[in-house]
Amino acid sequence: MISFAEKLSFLMHITETSNKELAAELSVDPSMVSLMRTGKRRLSKKPIQVRKMALFFAKRSPAAFQRQALSEMLGQVSISPSMPTEVLASSLENWLQGKSDTIADTILSGIQALPDLPQPAPIRPTPAPASENQTLFFYGEEGRREVMSRMMQEMQQMETPGTILTVVDDNLEWLLSDYLLTKKIQSGFLELSERGFTVYQIMPTLNYINRYAESLQFWLPIYATGQIKVYYYPRLRGNLYRHSIIVVPGCCVQYTCAVATGSTSDITMFSTDPQLVSAFEKQFQEHIALCRPSLNAHQDPRDFLPCFLELFSRQGDTIQAVNSLSINSMPRELLEQLVRDAGTSDWAAGYKIHLEELPHFEERLRHAPYIDMCWLSSAAEVRSGTVPVVAFSKEYSGFLCYTPKTYCLHLKNILRLMEQYENYFFLPLDKKERPGYNLFVNEGDLALIVRTVEPFILLEIRQTAMITALQEHLLKKADAVGYDGIHREKVRMKLRSLIQELGG
């Protein structure tokens, strides 16, 4: 792992920056920069200082050779001369802070950043549609880019929304290395989703693709529209050749094949031949029949309930991190109150089902561990009447917030579960900054990520490797807090203290 001192020296070298110049930018003495370069001084904990440093180096790295060096050092193929300075500064900021670029981090940071993602208005294509019965061949990365642009033109010119069938079996380096084209294609897919196009995609598992995190950053905003259904082939396969397919039934097809070790051998076909398009469509249907669901997105909160019921009914280890006390640990009397207050709303049926499932949940605790990480509210927050019940915002819950009495009821039930079941672990999280998501993981089977600010989105993840990555992310957080032995008793003491402060 590269130290901060080594990172700083590298950046100062490729930008030909002196200690005095960087010190002037940061408003510190040059000796401070010297200490940081020798490892005797750590990176400032002040976010504004790190941001200023990252932006300073990004502005001084416009040349192609500098961007290439940064791309190799940071392991991000998307760092190219066309990448805006502000975007490069953000990547440098994360790198300097030592933030990892794991699959879990990519998904969780991406789901929070969705509204902030730049979505430039797509430029409407002007070229005429391709001639029918036309089959053309293109070569190398430039050929792939040209065909991708042609495919996007054909799809955007369709008057009626249709279906797009895709097999993505490569690492997208040919696309990600061109920042402007990447944003144009991403924007095009977002526009097609808004128009009502449905996309079916077959993706490889994590261990069959390089740059998976960067590829995921490209696709995640498109997944979040809910218009794309993602599948994966679960069996082992050869890894010599890579190929990708885009089929627009009744319109056109793109097919690319290359040796996996490089991109210089890429051969890409573009065709509007009806027979060829139909043949590739049939081949895709045969392929997807052998695949399993990988990821789905839901935007309507009413569609969330079936996913949660499936998660809570599964056996095996479960771990979750949520921004409120969880519904699983809620006492019966509070759930009954929720049912009454919900009346005939869409929430009533869900609360009734959870009420009926309480005995099954406790029976499950006899057989498998359940780690319940929740952000605790302070006594002052509870007394203010602004802490929603089983929700991440008042807008989402719509009708009920905790009182000191009901919050104490919930805390007392958590204590009861801890006393009665050794497999139930409650970890109070009290950091001031809560993430913009709730995360639930059942070992090896299902993971749910709920975006907790508008627009509300639920990602339903079923690919084993992705689930494992998210589970390891939560277990690392749980291990850092501590949840067994002496830590268990400390949690009890913390809960009793809060109950006493609330007058319970």
What would you call each of these model-derived segments?
Residues 18-24:
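Short alpha-helical "recognition helix" segments of helix-turn-helix
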Residues 62-138, 149-153:
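Helix-turn-helix/homeodomain-like alpha-helical modules used for DNA recognition
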